[in-house]
Amino acid sequence: MGSYMNKTSVVKVGNVLIGGDNPVVVQSMTDTYTADVEKTVKQILALHKAGSEIVRITVNDEPAAAAVPEIVKELANHDCHVPLVGDFHYNGHTLLSKYPECAKALAKYRINPGNVGFGKKKDTQFAEIIKIAIANDKPVRIGVNWGSLDQALLARLIDENNAQENPLSLQQIMHKALITSALESAKYAEELGLAKDKIIISCKVSEVQDLIAVYQKLAKECDYALHLGLTEAGMGTKGIVASAVSLGILLQQGIGNTIRVSLTPAPNAPRTEEVRVCREILQNLGMRTFTPSVTSCPGCGRTTSSFFRELTSKVKDHLDEKMHTWKEQYHGVEAMKVAVMGCVVNGPGESKNADIGISLPGSGESPVAPVFIDGKKAHTLRGDNISEEFIEIVENYVKNRYGKK
């Protein structure tokens, strides 16, 4: 795992610390109409339960702004105190001024320099939001997006570039514009009185190589806390892979303090998928541990039986279900490693390397399944109840190994 290239400022968002030596924070965003309090609260609760440590909500009109305090109140009634970030575009200055209770209830404001205001109004409207943030002691994310980049700034940089003897490519100018927009806005916010430890910045694009290039340069040019994410990752496998590759490379280099995976959900798919992907990225990089990991083989001609796949699914589902109570009872259980293997080739070796593992018989092998605990063979299972018996062994292992807090 890489070490931080630059020690960033630490920003407190509600009860969550972002930056410095703090763990990378998982974020998500709702897709409900914020004024629908019931649906919005339900989705925030689901995202938080899935592991989102900060949740962003759209605040795009007066009904949404008016609903924010009620949303926070309803969440508290469910004993949920996850920090909420208000996502503002175009009219944030108006909504925050007109609805001061909204400004107080939110834990952070997101401002887009590309649409906070246009022409002479840009600086004035940006300043209005910053002053409200200062008055309410709130942090701000200055979130630049290449789909809504400040066109006046881009035109200025293009003109300057055209006058150079060795001009940059259009792609390089786009990268420069993203970074310049973020850093000039952050500098202006500081000039207005917002402390550096109240500022998080992001420069989001939709292509993997562009994101990597922009953040590598950004990390060298500033010590603000950085929010990572592709702006539109896409749907399904494409979105997951693009996010894992881009965020994984940057995080491994020590760049990034908080992440969000902007997946397009499949029809009727749970919004929580983006949280699961964030957690898997961080856990597979060895940066954080959230739930016991299950190592399992993909199957081959030696494993003609589907039983090992079924057992793997049962074990993973059982661990995911139990973690809601285990994390309160058993300290360190989230780092447990379980192996479910399908034949003798790699089964015993992987099982020995896990905290607890089972090596199922492959085609033509003796119909027995040795169980290894802490590297040593501890049980031999056979018959029709291997799944139930192995899960019971896992349960007992957790109780004996991790004990109660």
UniProtKB/Swiss-Prot annotation:
Catalysed reactions listed for this entry: (2E)-4-hydroxy-3-methylbut-2-enyl diphosphate + oxidized [flavodoxin] + H2O + 2 H(+) = 2-C-methyl-D-erythritol 2,4-cyclic diphosphate + reduced [flavodoxin]
One BP term from GO: terpenoid biosynthetic process
Stored SUPFAM superfamilies: Nitrite and sulphite reductase 4Fe-4S domain-like (SSF56014)
Enzyme Commission no: 1.17.7.3
UniProt entry keywords in alphabetical sequence: 4Fe-4S, Iron, Iron-sulfur, Isoprene biosynthesis, Metal-binding, Oxidoreductase
One GO MF term attached to the UniProt entry: 4 iron, 4 sulfur cluster binding
Family from the record: Belongs to the IspG family.
Official protein name in the record: 4-hydroxy-3-methylbut-2-en-1-yl diphosphate synthase (flavodoxin)
Gene name of the record: ispG
